C-alpha cells in the first residue's frame, strides 16, 4: 500500500540532486569572499558566459518591445553575468533614454524627443511607431472662416496690446490666423496673367491714370482703390506685381498737411489732378504684360457701381468695421419671447380728485386659498408698501407663476411674459406680502363697521 506521506522538499534533497560539476544556485547567489582578498566587502563571482545582449528576448503579443526599467536594488553594474544571475541584471542593456532620471521624475516632463517614445509605459503594439506629437498623429484643425470669428480674433489682438512684448508667439499666431480668415472672406479675385521666362535686362516703366473726379464729385474713389488700411491696394500689388500709388490733389486725408506740403520738393504731384500711378519693374519681355494687367484692374475700380450692388464696397465696409471693433453681427429676434409693457409702481402716492375704494377684506376679489390668504388690500399706501417688508422670497418658487397663471381674471386674458422679476412684483404687489405684514396692515387700514372711511385709511394708489 503506497504511503500517503508527503515527501519533504528541503535543502538536503536539492543538494543531493545536483551534480558535482555544476555549482548550486544558492552558492552562486550567496556573496562569498574572493581568494586572496582581505577586504570585508562581498561581491558576486564573475563567470564568463554568453553576453547578455545575445540572449533571446521573449516577446509577448500586445506588449511593447521596450522592457520596463528594473528596480535600483536589482540592477547589477557589471557587464559579465552568470547564466544563473537574476533576470533583472539583463536590463543594463536598456537604452539610456529609459533609464534617465527625467523619464521617471514626475516634476519634469518631456514634450517630444526622437529617441523617447511618447507613451513609454503603454502596452500597445503601436506605441513605438509614432509619437503623440508627430505629424502623422496630429492633423491641423481648420476653423470655419466667418465674420464673427474674424471679429473675435481682432478683438483678442487688441487685448494683447495691453501686454507688449510678452506674448510674441501668440501675436504671431493671431496675425497668421487673421490673415488666413481675411483672405478667405474678403479677398478680391484679381485674375493672374501668365508670364514668360525672364529674358533681358531689368527696366522700370510708369503709367498714370486720372480719376474721373469731375464726373463723379461725390464718389470716394480713393477709398475704393486703397481699401481699409490699404488692404485692397496691397492685394492688387501682390497679384499684378506692380506698385499702386494714389497721387494728386485730394490724395491725402489731412487737407492741412496737403496744403503745407504743396510746392515742396518731392511733392510736385500735389499740383496735378487726382490720379493713380502704376509702376512696374521687370525684364523687357515681362514688364509690359504686368503693367497692362495692372492698368486694366485699376480702370475697373474707377467705374462706380450702382448703389446697393457694389459688392467690393460692402466687403470693405465690413472689414473696416471689424478692424475698428464696431462690427455687430445681425441676429434674428426671438419670436417666442414677447416684450410686454408693464407699468411700474410709483414711489410716491398719486394724487387724484376721488379716492379708489375697494374691499379691505382679504379674498373678496381673488380666492385667498391660492397664496395662503396673503393678498393685500389695494388701498395700501405706497409709502407703507415700499417701507415695509412686503416681498416674501419664499414665494419665488417654480409653482408660483403656474398658480398665478391659473387665476382666470378674464376669459380672453393671457398670462404675459414678464421680462424681469422686478416688473412682475411691481405689477402685482399684493401677491408678495407675508401674513404678518398683512395682519398689521389690516388693523390700520380697515375702518370700523358703520363708520365712513377716513382720509387716513383711504389713499390713491395706481397699479
From Swiss-Prot:
- Residue stretches making up the KH domain: 208-260
Disordered: region residues: 1-76, 443-463
Q: What is known of its domains?
A: The KH domain and the Qua2 region are involved in RNA binding.
**Site residues (Involved in RNA binding), renumbered to this chain:** 220, 243, 247, 313, 316
Role noted for this protein: RNA-binding protein which recognizes the 5'-UACUCAU-3' RNA consensus sequence. Binds sequences in both the 5'coding and the 3'-UTR region of rme-2 mRNA. Binds sequences in the 3'-UTR region of cye-1 mRNA. Binds to cyb-2.1, cyb-2.2 and cyb-3 mRNA. Binds sequences in the 3'-UTR region of tra-2 mRNA. Binds to the 3' UTR of Notch receptor homolog glp-1, thereby repressing glp-1 translation in the embryo. Binding to the glp-1 3' UTR is inhibited by pos-1 binding to an overlapping binding site in the glp-1 3' UTR. Germ line-specific tumor suppressor essential for oogenesis.
> Which species does this protein come from?
Caenorhabditis elegans
Query: Residue ranges of region Qua1 domain?
Result: 135-205
Note whether Ribosomal protein occurs among the keywords.
Answer: no
The UniProt annotation puts the region (Qua2 domain) at 305-336
Q: Where is the composition biased (Polar residues)?
A: 1-10
**Compositional bias ranges of the Low complexity kind:** 11-31, 447-457
Tell me a GO biological process for this protein.
regulation of gene expression
What happens after mutating residue 177 to G? Loss of monomer stability
Q: What is the effect of changing residue 149 to F?
A: Moderate decrease in monomer stability
Q: Which domain of life is it from?
A: Eukaryota
| InterPro entries, A to Z | BBP-like, KH_1_KHDC4/BBP-like, KH_dom, KH_dom_type_1_sf, STAR_dimer
Which residue positions does UniProt flag as site: Important for the interaction between KH and Qua2 domains? 228, 320
| UniProt-reported outcome of changing residue 313 to R | 11-fold decrease in RNA binding affinity
User: Could you describe the post-translational modifications of this protein?
Assistant: Phosphorylated by cdk-2 which may negatively regulate its expression in distal mitotic germline cells.
Question: Would you tell me the Gene Ontology cellular component terms?
Answer: cytoplasm; cytosol; nucleus; P granule
In the record, the effect of residue 228 to S is given as: In rrr1; 89-fold decrease in RNA binding affinity. Small abnormal stacked oocytes and feminization of germline. Overexpression of oma-2 and to a lesser extent of egg-1 in germline
Which protein, by its recorded name, is this?
Answer: Female germline-specific tumor suppressor gld-1
Q: What is the effect of changing residue 164 to A?
A: No effect on homodimer stability
| Reported effect, residue 22 to A | May abolish phosphorylation by cdk-2. Increased expression in the gonad mitotic zone and reduction in the size of the mitotic region
Amino acid at each position: 500500500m503506497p504511503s500517503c506521506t508527503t515527501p519533504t522538499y528541503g535543502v538536503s534533497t536539492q543538494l543531493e540532486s545536483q551534480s558535482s560539476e555544476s555549482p548550486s544556485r544558492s552558492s552562486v547567489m550567496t556573496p562569498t569572499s574572493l581568494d586572496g582578498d582581505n577586504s570585508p566587502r562581498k561581491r558576486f563571482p564573475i563567470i564568463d558566459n554568453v553576453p547578455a545582449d545575445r540572449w533571446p528576448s521573449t516577446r509577448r503579443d500586445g506588449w511593447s518591445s521596450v522592457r520596463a526599467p528594473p528596480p535600483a536594488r536589482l540592477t547589477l553594474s557589471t557587464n559579465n553575468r552568470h547564466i544563473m544571475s537574476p533576470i533583472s541584471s539583463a536590463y543594463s542593456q536598456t537604452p539610456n533614454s529609459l533609464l534617465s532620471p527625467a523619464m521617471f521624475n514626475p516634476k519634469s516632463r518631456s514634450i517630444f524627443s526622437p529617441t523617447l517614445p511618447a507613451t513609454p509605459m503603454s502596452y500597445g503594439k503601436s506605441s513605438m511607431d509614432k509619437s503623440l506629437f508627430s505629424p502623422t498623429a496630429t492633423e491641423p484643425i481648420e476653423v470655419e472662416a466667418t465674420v464673427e470669428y474674424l471679429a473675435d480674433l481682432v478683438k483678442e489682438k487688441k487685448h494683447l496690446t495691453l501686454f507688449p512684448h510678452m506674448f510674441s508667439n501668440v501675436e504671431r499666431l493671431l496675425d497668421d490666423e487673421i490673415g488666413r480668415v481675411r483672405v478667405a472672406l474678403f479677398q478680391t479675385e484679381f485674375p493672374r496673367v501668365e508670364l514668360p521666362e525672364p529674358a533681358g535686362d531689368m527696366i522700370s516703366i510708369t503709367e498714370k491714370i486720372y480719376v474721373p473726379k469731375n464726373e463723379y464729385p461725390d464718389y470716394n474713389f480713393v477709398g475704393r482703390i486703397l481699401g481699409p488700411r490699404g488692404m485692397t491696394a496691397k492685394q492688387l500689388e501682390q497679384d499684378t506685381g506692380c506698385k499702386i500709388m494714389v497721387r494728386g490733389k485730394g490724395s491725402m486725408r489731412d487737407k492741412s498737411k496737403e496744403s503745407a506740403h504743396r510746392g515742396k520738393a518731392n511733392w510736385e504731384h500735389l499740383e496735378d489732378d487726382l490720379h493713380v500711378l502704376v509702376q512696374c519693374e521687370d525684364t523687357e519681355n515681362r514688364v509690359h504684360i504686368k503693367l497692362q494687367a495692372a492698368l486694366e484692374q485699376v480702370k475697373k475700380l474707377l467705374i462706380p457701381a450702382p448703389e446697393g450692388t457694389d459688392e467690393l464696397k460692402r466687403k470693405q465696409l465690413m472689414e473696416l468695421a471689424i478692424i475698428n471693433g464696431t462690427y455687430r453681427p445681425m441676429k434674428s429676434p426671438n419670436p417666442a419671447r414677447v416684450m410686454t409693457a408693464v407699468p411700474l409702481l410709483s414711489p410716491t402716492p398719486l394724487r387724484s380728485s376721488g379716492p379708489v375704494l375697494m374691499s379691505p377684506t382679504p379674498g373678496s376679489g381673488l380666492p385667498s386659498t391660492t397664496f395662503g390668504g396673503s393678498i393685500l388690500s389695494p388701498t395700501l399706501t405706497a409709502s407703507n408698501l415700499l417701507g415695509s417688508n412686503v416681498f416674501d422670497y419664499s414665494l419665488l418658487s417654480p409653482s408660483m407663476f403656474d398658480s398665478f397663471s391659473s387665476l382666470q381674471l378674464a376669459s380672453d386674458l393671457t398670462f404675459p411674459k414678464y421680462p424681469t422679476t422686478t416688473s412682475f412684483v411691481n405689477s402685482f404687489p399684493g401677491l408678495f406680502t407675508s401674513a404678518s405684514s398683512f395682519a398689521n396692515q389690516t388693523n390700520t387700514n380697515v375702518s370700523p363697521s358703520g363708520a365712513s372711511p377716513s382720509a387716513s385709511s383711504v389713499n390713491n394708489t395706481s397699479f
